[in-house]
């Protein structure tokens, strides 16, 4: 039978519940347990797919095509279990499900209320999510409850967790509470009162935490831990200090050293083997002792909020681990390039344009791509970054001066990139597809396997085929592919049934390393294995640095 660990947060948001939950999962997995994780989001949106990156950060896409919270990316990077749609749900999904049942008459005319109907539905979603784990029936399901204790939005989820713990019985569920212990500089000391009040809020609704994870900018002294223990009614050895670390991959060892996994296993009556965190120690060793160094420019419009590119940043870090290369990322606002030109790119070892939506800043990105192509600087374009690379090539090499995407110019006569409902076929006729067509609507989501053209750089990187995740509405228009190929561009991978361009590259006779991909490879990169595309990109960046005669 699956046992549950509920992870809650107090005092303020953004303390790192997702990292804490993922780190605990990594330790338990290293002890031979099958583990899955779930994220419960209190917002009323059905999913984060249409939420602004400035509000929500990255949208992480699962293999089965769900648009989910970025914490699911942390989960997949820390453990081997893959996440699915069922691993993340929101208040919006819960209410949508309950209202649908009420309309069907499932409640037999009863008054539908938060308790028991909403809380019962939350429990059903939790158990369904745990049961859908790709590792088979998990020994432990770690459930991260979003928001902050005391917020009205989180109350139904906390109440559902309390009821579920009671229903499952002793030693079947436990609670881990992450809270802030701030350092007040004027007083010169850490303050425990916010933590005391946060635990008090939990106890008011009937939840007694078994473990406190106390976040601070430094290790919490024993005297303060004893004080927290006494006022929170939590054993002293279960008051665990979580201080700021320069790498999230140090957190599993930090928590294990203080006995978190031992406490959880004792509470849940589990007797697994000892933890083996040697992999994490090796990763940290590689991280702290690189042999080389490169600087990669990430050109985008969300550069002030790096949470928007969380998986991409981590994928570059993974590549740094597996190439013994420190990767310095410079975030460059594409609108600044539009205003000031490409001089800010000239010291870079490589250029990357990530995915995105909307017209703002696109001409700056295209200017950066032109610079990378003409200056022989390694270039990686992801999703929109590939589409813009195709547009730049069409304009500046093929001579299609009005080449554009209908996302940015709906009237352009040279629709090099377009919605699937806006394509022109080879005869110049509009090719229309509807919701009933094989591709569904205007957004392509989830994993798809595609064959790779032999003899290409893509084959050197991936092998015979590529299986990656997608999240996009627009595609390269097949009508223009013959002209692009005549200009030298190579379509190195296509979807097997629709023949859609998935990867493009320039031959080495034109450029040493210029690759665009329609999918999002960052979603499948892990610290354990890295990712072949990002490893190749970082190696190309270092080769470019050496070729320019810059000291490594």
From Swiss-Prot:
CTP binds at residues 13, 151-153, 191-196, 227. Allosterically activated by GTP, when glutamine is the substrate; GTP has no effect on the reaction when ammonia is the substrate. The allosteric effector GTP functions by stabilizing the protein conformation that binds the tetrahedral intermediate(s) formed during glutamine hydrolysis. Inhibited by the product CTP, via allosteric rather than competitive inhibition. GO terms for cellular component: cytosol. Pathway: Pyrimidine metabolism; CTP biosynthesis via de novo pathway; CTP from UDP: step 2/2. It catalyses: UTP + L-glutamine + ATP + H2O = CTP + L-glutamate + ADP + phosphate + 2 H(+); L-glutamine + H2O = L-glutamate + NH4(+); UTP + NH4(+) + ATP = CTP + ADP + phosphate + 2 H(+). Homotetramer. NCBIfam families: PRK05380.1, PyrG. This is CTP synthase. It comes from Burkholderia ambifaria (strain ATCC BAA-244 / DSM 16087 / CCUG 44356 / LMG 19182 / AMMD).
